């Protein structure tokens, strides 16, 4: 087998780059043990804008946390990529490749907004295309259920957006656990939901309320008895957001 | 070719600003079919003694005392002898501190009636964004708006400035100001500026909490932690890794931590909306270390960063005049009975119909 830094050098060619996230580069790669199987490598490069001490600490912590969470979830019923291999020192994680679109892109396609919501202006009053409503609803309810299962496993994602849920054969798979952590606290789960709500509002502004309703419908269907406390906290977090004094 | 003139009044926090702007329209059908001239931009800041913040009542009194003189100076400098020739009076309708906003809107209503000129209420945040776009020439950037009361990551979509990320509790400028109060760092010209100067001499990095939640962030925990360190420093027993920590080290560590968080959420928003440009606005935006860090991040994404200097970053009247005039040219006017100010006025409430 080739050593990892060498491997990375071979990988890090532009043609292998699948995505440039906020803090990681995702390359398609060969599985380290099963050469016929395709997988991806998530690499956290050094961030020269921040202090080396802080950067090293964050990269190591997040790579480890992501791997731990993926490993924990591998035994449960939440759909996440399989963890293949980790090299925390070099900030590398090998994992299963999920084929499909992100929910963000899929919704934009469904809405007929191919160039991307945040970059394009459109008419404000457009209604949802009739034929697509049921597939949008079904999918978002499923996404909500997946998030519910995640919280039921006491995992908080930390960055729930429609970019971080993929659709594989129409079934949602949650990805990118770089900011994830283990928590049983209703407060942490509520902040997770608040982040999701805000991301939907900004990314899919025209029908955000409807989309959130569907997500929560799915979420509430699976979380069970812990839901009361989480939803109550969510109300608190929303208030905090709204009340924030806005001077300046 | 048509020209339009607007006078803007800003007083949502401790700066009182009045500015006059001129738009010369060459192509009325194009979004960018006009040029902008800044005829005057006058500001007076209410400065409190070290260790104290500015209270609404005292700030409002400062604005009342100065507003007439500042308006006169702005008109003189703009060489406007007949103010009835102005096309609109723009004023900050919110968000901000209640009492200071109130005292300035009274001035706005008065001159509008004296001169028979329509009023236009402006959202403070939109004022910052529009001024930043105009000065830097950034066309469709992700905007990081950082000031004493606001911390937001914004991108334009479908006629609104959408908030992608923001603070879940206190603003970054508030965090810096309150830290400055503990160490009695002077408030002139601004606490943030003095922290920036001290931070340049800091060497030892003291680890602080790092709390990013997706595109949002939280800073109250960082503040509490660094305040407790500052108090230990004042008591003379702050040693980390065998190193005697100085006030400079604390300023340095606080800046590095907060700004790393800000750059990270901005980068996350850029990745999320596929944008290559960043624009930094708001008072904290004139911090050169923040601009430098943002520049490194943008460069690594093959993008670019746009920032302005203190004339436009720090609250000013010209940005209000500018955003007000953009709205007025679309036929927007705030009727006298609708000119109440509001402390809470979300950036995404404004219909941005001057952009496509």
From Swiss-Prot, chain A:
Q: Please name the catalytic residues of this protein.
A: 159
> What does the record give as the reaction this protein catalyses?
L-seryl-[protein] + ATP = O-phospho-L-seryl-[protein] + ADP + H(+); L-threonyl-[protein] + ATP = O-phospho-L-threonyl-[protein] + ADP + H(+)
Entry-linked Pfam families: APH (PF01636)
Q: Where in the cell is it found?
A: Cytoplasm; Nucleus; Chromosome, Telomere
Is-annotated flag, keyword Phosphoprotein?
yes
SUPFAM superfamilies, alphabetized: Protein kinase-like (PK-like) (SSF56112)
Q: Which Gene3D superfamilies match?
A: Phosphorylase Kinase, domain 1, Transferase(Phosphotransferase) domain 1
UniProt note: domains: This protein is considered an atypical serine/threonine kinase, because it lacks the conventional structural elements necessary for the substrate recognition as well as a lysine residue that in all other serine/threonine kinases participates in the catalytic event. BUD32 has protein kinase activity in vitro, but in the context of the EKC/KEOPS complex, the catalytic subunit KAE1 switches the activity of BUD32 from kinase into ATPase.
Q: Which protein is depicted?
A: EKC/KEOPS complex subunit BUD32
Query: Which organism is this protein's natural source?
Result: Yarrowia lipolytica (strain CLIB 122 / E 150) (Yeast)
Could you tell me the gene encoding this protein?
BUD32
From Swiss-Prot, chain B:
The catalytic activity, as recorded, is: L-threonylcarbamoyladenylate + adenosine(37) in tRNA = N(6)-L-threonylcarbamoyladenosine(37) in tRNA + AMP + H(+)
A GO BP term here is: tRNA threonylcarbamoyladenosine modification
> Which cofactors go with this protein?
a divalent metal cation
Q: Is Zinc one of the keywords?
A: no
Which free-text remark accompanies the cofactor?
A: Binds 1 divalent metal cation per subunit.
Reported EC number(s) for this entry are 2.3.1.234
Cellular component terms (Gene Ontology) = chromatin; cytoplasm; EKC/KEOPS complex; nucleus
- Please give one Gene Ontology molecular function term for this protein: chromatin DNA binding
Q: What class of enzyme is it?
A: transferase
Q: Which residues cross the membrane?
A: none
Subunit field text: Component of the EKC/KEOPS complex composed of at least BUD32, CGI121, GON7, KAE1 and PCC1; the whole complex dimerizes.
Q: Which family does it belong to?
A: Belongs to the KAE1 / TsaD family.
The identity of this protein, by name, is tRNA N6-adenosine threonylcarbamoyltransferase
Native organism taxonomy: Eukaryota, Fungi, Dikarya, Ascomycota, Saccharomycotina
């Amino acid at each position: 087998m080739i050593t990892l830094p060498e491997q990375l050098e071979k990988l890090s060619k532009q043609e292998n780059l699948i995505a440039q996230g906020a803090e990681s580069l995702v390359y398609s790669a060969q599985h380290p043990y099963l050469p016929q199987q395709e997988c991806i490598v998530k690499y956290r490069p050094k961030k020269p804008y921040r202090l080396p001490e802080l950067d090293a600490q964050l990269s190591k912590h997040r790579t480890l946390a992501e791997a731990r969470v993926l490993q924990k979830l591998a035994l449960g019923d939440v759909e996440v990529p399989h963890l293949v291999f980790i090299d925390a020192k070099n900030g590398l994680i090998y994992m299963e490749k999920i084929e499909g679109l992100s929910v963000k892109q899929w919704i934009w396609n469904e809405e007929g907004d191919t160039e991307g919501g945040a970059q394009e202006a459109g008419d404000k009053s457009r209604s949802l295309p009739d034929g697509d409503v049921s597939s949008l609803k079904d999918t978002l309810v499923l996404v909500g259920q997946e998030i519910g299962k995640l919280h039921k496993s006491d995992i908080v994602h930390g960055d729930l957006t429609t970019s971080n849920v993929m659709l594989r054969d129409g079934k949602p798979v949650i990805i990118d656990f770089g900011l994830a952590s283990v928590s049983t606290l209703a407060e942490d789960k509520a902040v997770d939901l608040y982040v999701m709500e805000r991301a939907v509002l900004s990314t899919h502004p025209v029908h955000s309320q409807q989309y959130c309703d569907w997500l929560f419908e799915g979420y509430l269907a699976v979380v069970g008895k812990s839901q009361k406390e989480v939803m109550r906290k969510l109300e608190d977090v929303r208030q905090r957001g709204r009340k924030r004094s806005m001077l300046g | 070719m048509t020209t339009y003139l607007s006078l803007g009044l800003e007083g949502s926090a401790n700066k009182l600003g009045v500015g006059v702007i001129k738009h010369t329209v060459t192509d009325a059908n194009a979004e960018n079919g006009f040029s902008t001239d800044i005829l005057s931009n006058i500001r007076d800041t209410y400065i409190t003694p070290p260790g104290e913040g500015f209270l609404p009542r005292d700030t409002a009194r400062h604005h009342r005392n100065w507003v007439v003189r500042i308006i006169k100076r702005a008109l003189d400098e703009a060489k406007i002898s007949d103010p009835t020739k102005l096309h609109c009076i723009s004023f900050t309708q919110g968000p901000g501190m209640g009492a200071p906003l109130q005292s300035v809107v009274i001035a706005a209503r008065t001159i509008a009636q004296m001169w028979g000129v329509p009023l236009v209420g402006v959202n403070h945040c939109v004022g910052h964004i529009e001024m930043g776009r105009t000065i830097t020439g950034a066309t469709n950037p992700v905007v990081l708006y950082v000031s004493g009361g606001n911390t937001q990551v914004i991108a334009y979509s479908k006629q609104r400035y959408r908030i992608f990320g923001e603070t879940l509790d206190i603003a970054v400028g508030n965090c810096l100001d309150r830290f400055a109060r503990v160490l009695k760092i002077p408030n002139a010209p601004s606490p943030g500026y003095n922290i920036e100067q001290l931070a340049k001499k800091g060497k030892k990095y003291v680890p602080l909490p790092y709390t990013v939640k997706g595109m949002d962030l939280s800073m109250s925990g960082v503040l509490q932690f660094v305040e407790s360190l500052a108090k230990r420093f004042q008591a003379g027993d702050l040693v980390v890794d065998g190193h005697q920590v100085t006030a400079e080290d604390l300023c340095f560590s606080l800046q590095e931590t907060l700004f790393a968080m800000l750059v990270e959420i901005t980068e996350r928003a850029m990745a999320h909306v596929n944008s290559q440009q960043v624009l930094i606005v708001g008072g904290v935006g004139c911090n050169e270390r923040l601009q430098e860090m943002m520049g490194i991040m943008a460069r690594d994404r093959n993008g670019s960063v746009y920032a302005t200097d203190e004339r436009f970053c720090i609250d000013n009247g010209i940005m209000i005049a500018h955003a007000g005039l953009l709205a007025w040219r679309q036929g927007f006017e705030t009727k006298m009975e609708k000119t109440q100010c509001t402390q809470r006025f979300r950036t995404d409430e404004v219909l941005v119909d001057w952009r496509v």
